[in-house]
From Swiss-Prot:
<comment type="function">
    <text>Cell division protein that is part of the divisome complex and is recruited early to the Z-ring. Probably stimulates Z-ring formation, perhaps through the cross-linking of FtsZ protofilaments. Its function overlaps with FtsA.</text>
</comment>
<feature type="compositionally biased region" description="Polar residues">
    <location>
        <begin position="156"/>
        <end position="167"/>
    </location>
</feature>
<dbReference type="InterPro" id="IPR038594">
    <property type="entry name" value="SepF-like_sf"/>
</dbReference>
<protein>
    <recommendedName>
        <fullName>Cell division protein SepF</fullName>
    </recommendedName>
</protein>
<dbReference type="InterPro" id="IPR023052">
    <property type="entry name" value="Cell_div_SepF"/>
</dbReference>
<feature type="region of interest" description="Disordered">
    <location>
        <begin position="156"/>
        <end position="191"/>
    </location>
</feature>
<keyword id="KW-0963">Cytoplasm</keyword>
<comment type="subunit">
    <text>Homodimer. Interacts with FtsZ.</text>
</comment>
<dbReference type="GO" id="GO:0043093">
    <property type="term" value="P:FtsZ-dependent cytokinesis"/>
</dbReference>
<keyword id="KW-0132">Cell division</keyword>
<dbReference type="GO" id="GO:0005737">
    <property type="term" value="C:cytoplasm"/>
</dbReference>
<dbReference type="Pfam" id="PF04472">
    <property type="entry name" value="SepF"/>
</dbReference>
<dbReference type="InterPro" id="IPR007561">
    <property type="entry name" value="Cell_div_SepF/SepF-rel"/>
</dbReference>
<keyword id="KW-0131">Cell cycle</keyword>
<keyword id="KW-0717">Septation</keyword>
<comment type="similarity">
    <text>Belongs to the SepF family.</text>
</comment>
<dbReference type="GO" id="GO:0000917">
    <property type="term" value="P:division septum assembly"/>
</dbReference>
C-alpha cells in the first residue's frame, strides 16, 4: 500500500486502515489485582515514597552548598560575660558578636584610657553589624547583635523617699554639666 492510498483512505474514512494494526492481547485487570493483593513489597514501597519528605536532604540528593549563618539556631541565646585586662582581648568580643552572642563587657580591670579605647572599638564593631549597645553601670556595657532587641525598662517609680526630693532633683539636673564618664577623673571646665 502506498502512502497516497493510505492518505486517501484516512480522508475518506475508510475502515481499511483498522486492519493494519496488530491487536495485542493485554488484560490490564490482572495486573491491577496482582498489585493490590499479592505485591506487599510494592505497596510498602509506594507508602514509603508517598510519606517521604521531598525536602529531606538525605533523600538521595547530594548535600547542598548553602552555609548557614553562625549562631542562628533554635537553641537558647547565649550571653558572654567578659572582663578583659587589656585591649588585646577586644577581638574576642567582636568575634562573639559576629557569632550572634550578647556580650556584657566589664571594663573595671582596665586602665581608663584603654577602657575608652576598648569601648570605642567594640561600639564600632557593634555598629558595623547593626547591633545594639547599652551602658549598664559604671564601666559595664551591654553589646548585642542585631537579632537581639535591647530595651531599657528601668523607670523610677514614685515612692515616699523620692517624692519629696523630686523638685530639687529637677533643678540640680538642669544646672549640672554633662555626666561624667564611667572611668577616670574629669577636669572641671569653666562655663
Amino acid at each position: 500500500m502506498s502512502l497516497i492510498s493510505r492518505l486517501r483512505a484516512v480522508v475518506a474514512g475508510d475502515d481499511f486502515l483498522d486492519s493494519d494494526f496488530d491487536e495485542l492481547e493485554y488484560d490490564s485487570s490482572d495486573d491491577f489485582e496482582n498489585f493490590n493483593r499479592g505485591n506487599k513489597e510494592g505497596s510498602t514501597e509506594m507508602a514509603t515514597i508517598s510519606q517521604a519528605n521531598p525536602f529531606d536532604g538525605r533523600s538521595g540528593f547530594p548535600p547542598s552548598n548553602v552555609i548557614g549563618m553562625p549562631g542562628i539556631s533554635t537553641n537558647d541565646s547565649e550571653v558572654s560575660l567578659m572582663e578583659p585586662r587589656s585591649f588585646d582581648e577586644m577581638p574576642r568580643v567582636i568575634q562573639a558578636l559576629r557569632e550572634r552572642k550578647t556580650v556584657i563587657l566589664n571594663l573595671t580591670m582596665m586602665e581608663p584610657d584603654q577602657a575608652q579605647r576598648a569601648v570605642d572599638f567594640v561600639a564600632g564593631g557593634t555598629f558595623a553589624i547593626d547591633g545594639h549597645q547599652e551602658r549598664v553601670g559604671e564601666s559595664i556595657f551591654l553589646f548585642a547583635p542585631s537579632c537581639v532587641t535591647v530595651t531599657n525598662s528601668f523607670q523610677e517609680e514614685a515612692s515616699p523617699s523620692n517624692m519629696s526630693n523630686k523638685g530639687n532633683d529637677l533643678i540640680s539636673k538642669e544646672t549640672s554639666p554633662a555626666p561624667e564618664p564611667a572611668w577616670g577623673e574629669t577636669v572641671a571646665t569653666a562655663l
